Amino acid sequence: MLPIEVGADLRSRHIEGYIQDNTGDNISAKNKMYCELTAQYWAWKNLDADYYGFFHYRRYLNFSENKYPLDSWQNITEERLNDTCLKKYNLNDDCIRNLVETYDIVLSEEKNVAKMPDRNTSVYEQYKNGRSLNIRDLDLVRDIIAVKYPDYLDTFEDVMKGRKTCLCNMYIMKKELFHEYMSWLFNILFEFEKQTDMSKYTVEGYRTPGHLAERLLTVFCW
């Protein structure tokens, strides 16, 4: 695992021992908009690997075969990540390597939005009811896909009408698939940014590209 400090371009003090996302070809200065995607962009442009995967500082995948109780948001929760958790969820190089070498892509389990606290009936409705989110942004992304990637339009609409989606922008992908996904994703998001005035968005609303990417990951992998 390689720790990356995101948004490094926005601060003068950095986390010792971490790679910063503001080296080489990067979008670090846009971290308030693109969230964890600035790390993914950095890895895409600057890191050569056989597989690429992303966790958050407080979110990880479970690599064990065991099922554990879920909270109302369908997540497994722990007070902190410690040695017990590392063992419990098989968070070690050997277990991760054995799994990822078997598949082209590893994702978190799909979450059913109808079982979350807000009880939305579809992925589209969940976004529409999201705090600080604007459904016009998701509609614009649909229009962009219709122009740039029409072969994905039916899939996009199927995902939006459905109840299941993968959230949090976490995954592990084989190199070729990762590069394809990054090119596809940022081609859509950069076009969205070009067409959208977010100057009056709230702090959370300004993170819209990150929120959109969560839904787009499901579309790409569908």
Predicted regions and their residues:
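ER/Golgi luminal nucleotide-sugar-dependent glycosyltransferases, focusing on the catalytic module
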Residues: 1-222
